[in-house]
Regions:
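Conserved hydrophobic/aromatic pocket- or pore-lining residues that grip, position, or stack substrates
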Residues: 22, 43, 72, 104, ...
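Short alpha-helical functional segments enriched in proximate histidine and acidic residues
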Residues: 25, 29, 46, 50-53, ...
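Short, conserved beta-strand segments within well-ordered enzyme catalytic domains
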Residues: 35-36, 63-64, 68-70, 110, ...
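Immediate post-signal peptide segment of exported/extracytoplasmic ligand-binding proteins
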Residues: 50-68
Length: 169
């Protein structure tokens, strides 16, 4: 994050260019099945707003400016679908945002999409999902592992700077 923030401060990259880079990476790694939904328009709009905010007053941005984040499909994000990778929740739209979401947005992170997981986050291979198995970016013949495999692979494949996962442990 520090390197990205430094590049933004130096004007070497804009927030929009950063988001577009990650959107391209997502498109180029679709076969890994990490993402179940990409918030392309929303992420680009937020990036544009942050470009303007930073240009007007660099001190006004939050601690997580430049952090492009994917969120596991069990974490509620208001007005966005959340299915916990289960057919029973297909089409369910969250009525609220989880505290973690509220906090990262407050600090100017950009949420780029929702990532795959084991159904109801109960599993250790990330193969039990209505969206299909997540593939390991290092070796597509291997599983991603963990119920947060979509989150892990999203970072591993350089499709976001960070991803929220969970542990039901």
């Amino acid at each position: 994050l520090t390197a990205v923030q430094l590049d933004l401060k130096k004007g070497l990259i804009t927030f929009e260019e950063l988001v577009q880079y990650y959107l391209n990476q997502i498109e180029n790694t679709r076969d890994l099945n990490a993402y179940v939904e990409v918030y392309e328009k929303e992420a680009l709009k937020r990036a544009s707003e942050l470009d303007k905010k930073y240009k007007e007053n660099p001190e006004s941005v939050g601690k997580l400016f430049g952090m492009v984040v994917a969120i596991k499909d069990v974490i509620c994000y208001k007005d966005h679908e959340v299915t916990a990778a289960s057919k029973i929740l297909e089409g369910f739209t969250s009525l609220f945002s989880a505290t973690a979401i509220e906090r990262i947005l407050h600090e100017d992170a950009i949420i780029i999409g929702r990532v795959n997981c084991d159904q109801f986050a109960m599993g250790s291979t990330n193969e039990n999902s209505i969206y299909g198995a997540v593939r390991n970016a290092a070796n597509k013949n291997h599983v991603a592992g963990g119920s947060s495999g979509g989150s892990a692979v999203a970072v591993q494949a350089d499709t976001c700077l960070a991803a929220l996962g969970s542990d039901t442990g």
